[in-house]
């Protein structure tokens, strides 16, 4: 009678031994069907694990506080009667409102009603596209305008007001300093109580100022005053320069 055998390495005896041909090195043999089932099960486990690792996109909203409300996904309202009415908006604080897309309102009664507008501070207000108001009662109502400081105001397009009660009320106007005021187009006023009323005028210093008709004029120094009167068909006729404390340049072309 023929015997079918083979030689394998024994892990127990640490030598080669003669065994039946159906024996294996690592233990009992498995059929092809069993091996395929094991491989298929491993593949399913791999897919399940991969699914767990893939991030999921979830739209969510959150509101907390008496009477707070959110009307769209991806918005947050926190505080009594805080309200958001568009996607990607944030309202934090009592009676805050963020009512246009990407708007942010933070602080008691803060309101951000322009697209991409931000209002931070009690009673702060930001109403125009991409406007920014920072400070209690700060108001930014011009497109791309910025107001920083208590009661500061930036009402002109791309205007900037920095300081308590600073006001930039024309296009591209810049007012820097407590109670500084700029009403001239493209004008700059820097210093406490500085006032730039003329178009494209620059005033620097406490109480320095330019007249409304003194276009293209400069006043530098405490109390410096740039006047002048623009003539028809002469864009530079009113240009005056006053430099020094209480300096005055009142006639066209004065220095």
Regions found by a protein language model. Name each.
Residues 4, 10, 20-24, 28-42, ...:
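Glycine- and small/polar-enriched repetitive beta-structure motifs of secreted/surface proteins
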